[in-house]
């Protein structure tokens, strides 16, 4: 962060020392002028795409800033979050559900366009008077560069979602996916190799058939463009122990990793091989690290956040052991109560039980940690990293 500030200060100083005419031309960024003087725009776009810090491009001129959000320019990662309206109402009134995107260049939150009216978001329950001690899960996953709302409960405590809601950041639009074979709630949801998976859980009433069933939807462009864009039934799970609560199925090296309960309770882990369509038990040395939310960086490196201690661990697949990641002083305190985590671009984005979003830069030594300021009156449920939205109002 200090380096970032110093670079911005350096840019400001350079601009202040430039001749007035040149400074006006740079800051104004005439729409008809070349992106880079003396170069065709298509060559300039290639050159600018090699700059890996969008904030630097945004600070130069309006035209470069607009280029950042154009469909022709490579997307930079942005943070997407599912929020609910925060409330201290003792009656546990159900709050509104909304989706927003955090732009790392402008450091501002922007609402996503309204999703399709079916299912209405206000019918998805997060709080209910019958469940005072915990909130009802609303399950989202990200895959193939898209955000998918896949499971939740309605007022009758039945599955609220029969068709997944899919948001595409590039087109800034929502669509309804094909009907889920067995709509469910309190299930395992995850993604691997561009496909989303839904497993176990409960339908309107408990069913052993649903509790063992697994379905897959391939979201890759090749599959979406053909006539087979439908849910595919996979090999059943071996038992019913994964229908107790909503859990994450973590995509890792062409496998899905699932652990049936959260917290310090006795756990059971299962691994689904997406290539062989087969199940195997999770090794004890891997299972022991599940002390909080877990995510896989680029589906290759596992990280866990201990919800009680706030420690970050990284799984060494060769040695089959979890190793603690050293973080800056006071970092563990910020991560206590972690409820959900996503991993991308060398960073972990963590939702904590006290309603905060914390970023951990695990590429740094020691790992740096900071809070992302969230909009007033909102409580984060889950976060995801996807390409930025192509919207001119970001500029």
UniProtKB/Swiss-Prot annotation:
GO cellular component: nucleus
Chief location category: nucleus
Protein name: F-box/kelch-repeat protein SKIP25
Keywords noted in UniProt: Kelch repeat, Nucleus, Repeat, Ubl conjugation pathway
Residue stretches in coiled coil: none
Subunit (UniProt): Part of a SCF (ASK-cullin-F-box) protein ligase complex. Interacts with SKP1A/ASK1.
Disulfide bond annotation, renumbered to this chain: none
UniProt free text on domains: The F-box is necessary for the interaction with ASK proteins.
Domain F-box: 34-79
Pathway per the UniProt entry: Protein modification; protein ubiquitination
Chain positions covered by the region annotation Disordered: 1-29
A biological-process GO annotation: protein ubiquitination
Gene: SKIP25
Swiss-Prot/TrEMBL Kelch repeat ranges: 81-129, 147-194, 196-245, 246-299, 301-342
Cell compartment(s), UniProt: Nucleus
Lineage: Eukaryota, Viridiplantae, Streptophyta, Embryophyta, Tracheophyta
Organism: Arabidopsis thaliana (Mouse-ear cress)
InterPro entries given in the database record: F-box-like_dom_sf, Kelch-typ_b-propeller
Protein role: Component of SCF(ASK-cullin-F-box) E3 ubiquitin ligase complexes, which may mediate the ubiquitination and subsequent proteasomal degradation of target proteins.
């Amino acid at each position: 962060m200090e380096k970032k500030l110093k670079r911005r200060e350096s840019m400001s100083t350079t601009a202040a020392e430039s001749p007035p005419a040149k400074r006006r031309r740079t800051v104004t960024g005439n729409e008809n002028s070349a992106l880079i003087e003396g170069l065709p725009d298509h060559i300039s776009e290639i050159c600018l795409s090699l700059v890996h810090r969008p904030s630097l491009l945004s600070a130069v001129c309006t035209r470069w800033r607009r280029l950042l959000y154009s469909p022709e320019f490579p997307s930079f990662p942005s943070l997407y979050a599912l929020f609910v309206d925060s409330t201290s109402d003792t009656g546990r009134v159900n709050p509104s559900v909304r989706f927003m995107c955090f732009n790392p260049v402008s450091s501002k939150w922007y609402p996503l366009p309204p999703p399709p009216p079916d299912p209405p978001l206000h019918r998805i329950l997060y709080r209910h008077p019958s469940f005072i001690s915990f909130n009802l899960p609303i399950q989202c996953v990200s895959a193939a560069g898209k955000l998918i709302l896949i499971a939740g409960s309605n007022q009758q405590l039945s599955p609220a979602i029969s068709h997944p809601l899919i948001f595409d950041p590039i087109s800034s639009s929502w669509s309804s996916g094909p009907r889920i074979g067995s709509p469910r709630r309190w299930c395992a949801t995850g993604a691997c190799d561009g496909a989303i998976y839904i497993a176990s859980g409960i339908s309107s009433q408990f069913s052993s058939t649903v509790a063992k069933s697994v379905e897959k939807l391939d979201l890759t462009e090749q599959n979406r463009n053909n006539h087979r864009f439908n849910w595919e039934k996979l090999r059943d799970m071996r038992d019913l122990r994964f229908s107790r609560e909503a859990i994450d199925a973590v995509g890792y090296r062409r496998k899905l990793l699932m652990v049936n309960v959260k917290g310090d309770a006795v756990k059971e882990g299962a691994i689904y091989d997406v290539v062989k369509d087969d199940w195997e038990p999770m090794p004890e040395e891997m299972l022991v690290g599940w002390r909080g939310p877990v995510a896989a960086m680029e589906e290759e490196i596992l990280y866990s956040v201990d919800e009680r201690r706030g420690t970050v661990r990284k799984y060494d697949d060769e040695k089959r052991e979890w190793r603690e990641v050293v973080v800056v002083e006071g970092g563990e305190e910020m991560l206590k109560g972690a409820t959900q985590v996503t991993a991308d671009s060398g960073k972990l984005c963590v939702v904590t039980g006290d309603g905060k979003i914390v970023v951990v830069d695990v590429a740094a030594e020691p790992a740096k940690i900071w809070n992302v300021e969230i909009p007033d009156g909102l409580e984060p449920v889950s976060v995801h990293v996807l390409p930025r939205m192509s919207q001119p109002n970001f500029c």
